[in-house]
Amino acid sequence: MGSSESAEARRVSFEMDEEERVRVLQGIRLSESVVNRMKDCSQPSAGEQLAPGPGPECSVPVPTVPQPTIPVLTVPSPSVCGPAEGTYKAPQGDFKVSRAENSDGQQSSAVKEDLKKFQQEQLAVQDELVKVARKEKEATEKHLKASLPKKKATHEQQQSDRLTRELKNREAELSRRDTFYKEQQERIQEKNAELYKLSSQQFHEAASKAESTIKPRRVEPVCSGLQAQILRCYRDHLHEVLLCSDLAKAYQHCVSTARKG
């Protein structure tokens, strides 16, 4: 009899509410805190919802998870709910639920702490990067400002050296051309002297040969007296030249006679 009664007392049936969640347990009375805790357990835990990625730039908001509390279980008296042996299984299930909730809360708390620590480290790293970038920029600007005069002086010195080299090269080229032109001029003068000497020698030889082949002749003027008279007549009678016509005829007759003779 006792074993059959205890077996019947251990049978606990469950019922579903309108939202298909376990709400009513027949054979055991649950306190309001246990019911609320079971409602919370039916929803996905914060540890399951939150899965922070390894990306350094994203910040995942962490939902606030209430701290787990030990549920208070009110066990009815044997006179109301039956034998005490029938109510032995329910507290164990409640403690298991609260223990799972406690572990979920600890996990979410650890995740929250890790995320907070990661965000703090990320902010610190970003601050350090900003400081390093600022220092590098300042150092670069300082180096550029300091190197500008040096670069300018170096550029001017290089330009001066280049112009000096070009001037020396031009002077050397002019000197070489001057020497070349002087040599050419001396050669031309020597050739001209040789040509003049040769031409003079050839001219004298040709003149000597011509003198030896051509006999000299004495030439006397023909009718020189008449020529003098004609010139005097023309000078005295500039406007009456016809008066000198007789002298001109006599001169022509004299020349014709000299040719025939």
From Swiss-Prot:
Please report which protein family the annotation says this sequence is part of: Belongs to the MICOS complex subunit Mic19 family. Metazoan Mic25 subfamily.
Compositional bias (Basic and acidic residues): 154-165
Task: Provide the protein name.
Answer: MICOS complex subunit Mic25
Query: InterPro entries attached here?
Result: CHCH, MIC19/MIC25, MIC25
Recorded hits in Pfam families, A to Z, give: CHCH (PF06747), MIC19_MIC25 (PF05300)
- Sum up the protein's function in the record's words: Component of the MICOS complex, a large protein complex of the mitochondrial inner membrane that plays crucial roles in the maintenance of crista junctions, inner membrane architecture, and formation of contact sites to the outer membrane.
Region (Disordered): which ranges?
A: 39-59, 81-114, 140-165
**Phosphoserine: residues bearing it:** S13, S31, S33
Which range is the signal sequence, renumbered to this chain?
Answer: none
- Covalently lipidated residues (N-myristoyl glycine) read G2
Query: Which species is listed as the source?
Result: Rattus norvegicus (Rat)
User: What quaternary arrangement does the UniProt entry report?
Assistant: Component of the mitochondrial contact site and cristae organizing system (MICOS) complex, composed of at least MICOS10/MIC10, CHCHD3/MIC19, CHCHD6/MIC25, APOOL/MIC27, IMMT/MIC60, APOO/MIC23/MIC26 and MICOS13/MIC13. This complex was also known under the names MINOS or MitOS complex. The MICOS complex associates with mitochondrial outer membrane proteins SAMM50, MTX1 and MTX2 (together described as components of the mitochondrial outer membrane sorting assembly machinery (SAM) complex) and DNAJC11, mitochondrial inner membrane protein TMEM11 and with HSPA9.
The record lists the lineage as: Eukaryota, Metazoa, Chordata, Craniata, Vertebrata
